[in-house]
Amino acid sequence: MLNGCQSSKKTVTTATASPAMKNEKAERDASDLKQCQKNLNVLSRLHTTTYPSLKKNFDNLMLGASQYAGVRFQVNGQSQETIDALYRYRVSYLCSEIQQAALEVLVTRAELPK
């Protein structure tokens, strides 16, 4: 028998998160976004020079995400995964910038004059 000539069919399984895990992740994402908004508010209250540009970037990103949410289910699953990942990355990156800016301002203002 020629075993080498037979096509081997492999079953591919994909891992899917349970509804409870998805809900937990959504809650964590919402909490992270609220903290990001709080950090942005800190920059506003401290009258920093970085606030206007970070606020503009945040607002534009949220507007884009909102618009995408309105059409998300009209695109195929692979495109959804790609764009979802892109928005998660962009939000995470921007929120990291906001957090860093807030920490830098707070540390600078807490340092003793030399």
Per-region residue spans from a language model:
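Surface-exposed, polar/charged faces of alpha-helical domains
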Residues: 20-27, 31, 38-114
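Sec-dependent signal peptide cleavage junction
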Residues: 11-19
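Bacterial signal peptide processing site
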Residues: 6-9
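C-terminal motif of bacterial Sec signal peptides marking the signal peptidase cleavage site
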Residues: 2-4
